[in-house]
Amino acid sequence: MWTLVSWVALTAGLVAGTRCPDGQFCPVACCLDPGGASYSCCRPLLDKWPTTLSRHLGGPCQVDAHCSAGHSCIFTVSGTSSCCPFPEAVACGDGHHCCPRGFHCSADGRSCFQRSGNNSVGAIQCPDSQFECPDFSTCCVMVDGSWGCCPMPQASCCEDRVHCCPHGAFCDLVHTRCITPTGTHPLAKKLPAQRTNRAVALSSSVMCPDARSRCPDGSTCCELPSGKYGCCPMPNATCCSDHLHCCPQDTVCDLIQSKCLSKENATTDLLTKLPAHTVGDVKCDMEVSCPDGYTCCRLQSGAWGCCPFTQAVCCEDHIHCCPAGFTCDTQKGTCEQGPHQVPWMEKAPAHLSLPDPQALKRDVPCDNVSSCPSSDTCCQLTSGEWGCCPIPEAVCCSDHQHCCPQGYTCVAEGQCQRGSEIVAGLEKMPARRASLSHPRDIGCDQHTSCPVGQTCCPSLGGSWACCQLPHAVCCEDRQHCCPAGYTCNVKARSCEKEVVSAQPATFLARSPHVGVKDVECGEGHFCHDNQTCCRDNRQGWACCPYRQGVCCADRRHCCPAGFRCAARGTKCLRREAPRWDAPLRDPALRQLL
């Protein structure tokens, strides 16, 4: 929060300006920067708005019409929209206050300030708390699913996930323009959002009935036509029967007029639901997982731990981790990225993951050779073959092209009717042949196959399972597998590769002849073939039992080719990052004798 300096001089009418304690001259006023270490010029709100107070956000909304006159509907950092008692406003980072457009919020959100120049302070946090956009911009989802920034406040995000329009405008993608009540504007392009590089905050949210979807706090879960859940941007909302819209609490959906009706006969526009966020744990292996937004990292015990960053860097001490793009400085205990330095984080133990209930559901068989996904309904197509209606227990229409939700009847022109309500029918997709495997699949037996690049392994149930490695070794517990050339250590839950034990170096008497297959070290010493000469800590020679081995700086240990010495010579680390889906155990260090 900025601290105002020389306020008395300002109110006394010193239009000539004021001088900051650091000697800087400002035309109006001097403010202490948020960090408290420097000053900059500012202009407090003297005329229209209160000097030290912002305004509290009001009730939920989706458009300005849902707010009182003179108020505006703005997008907040929690992912919902609320009414702000300014006609044009920006949301503060605390999620509870707002300021007029053209101003920025203090750190605690209770004050509004305007800086000289165009540089804005602070940022708008995108809903997942990992990305942020500059002040007076809007978070919009990009084509790849990441967050982007539309360079205007409270913007309308277009369906192509590339463009955006001003607040209240409609995206006309066909003619590449934005349509407003006063005219048209060109489409604006979004820019990628910036990662905040701080730990993911698991904010409070509403869990939907499917136990896999979440909506932001202060919103309501409503089912979509697809059977999945969407979020109505207000608490305790009324979900409309078309599975597309919703209305505020204690109102009724009027789908014919596209309005929400209250007991006082007041009407508001229907609200459109937004897709819910699917809660998907990050899988470390078949048994262990971390929360969404975390990264799996090995602990010192060899078990999995959870780092509170996405795509994090796991530090070599197996205790700490750093944000993506940073490197671990084990001496300082920090994360480094050029001149930037942040504290590193400790990992938390991972938890056992439950099987995905959707993955356990079998396909719906249409006949002996055709099937549909578990949440679909088999309906015949005009060709006589089977098709899949994308909703469970659907009504198959007689035109063999459409289907309707349960409780509806098929009517003309591919529509569905229930009472006075009419919705568009759903088109069917061809069913898949259940008995034919993919032409490039690897057959386990006559009825079961695994994708190419994987290995068939016996499962606990007596059938087959797929190991996500080629030519893998199937472990005897029938739950795990290891890469080719490794053996399963079920007790340690690891994959191990046998390496020959260390051999002592042999001292030779001075002789002009050295064995043909021996490796000459010098000074009358040699090592056997497929070994490597290394200097020992007594300035003599020792033998590393690896061919082209790497001699560690402690002069007591060595590592195989392709590895590097770490942890002061007590550990070997691969020079190339291991596969994410094949957590292999590093070879044991060998003592030099």
Swiss-Prot record:
It comes from the Eukaryota. Keywords: Cytokine, Disulfide bond, Glycoprotein, Lysosome, Neurodegeneration, Neuronal ceroid lipofuscinosis, Repeat, Secreted, Signal. Coiled coil: none annotated. GO terms for molecular function: cytokine activity; growth factor activity; protein-folding chaperone binding; RNA binding. Cleaved by ELANE; proteolysis is blocked by SLPI and is concentration- and time-dependent and induces CXCL8/IL-8 production; granulin-3 and granulin-4 are resistant to ELANE. Cleaved by CTSL in lysosome thus regulating the maturation and turnover of progranulin within the lysosome. One of its GO terms (biological process) is positive regulation of epithelial cell proliferation. InterPro entries: Granulin (IPR000118), Granulin_fam (IPR039036), Granulin_sf (IPR037277). Pfam families: Granulin (PF00396). Residues 1-17 form the signal peptide. The keyword ATP-binding does not apply. This is Progranulin.
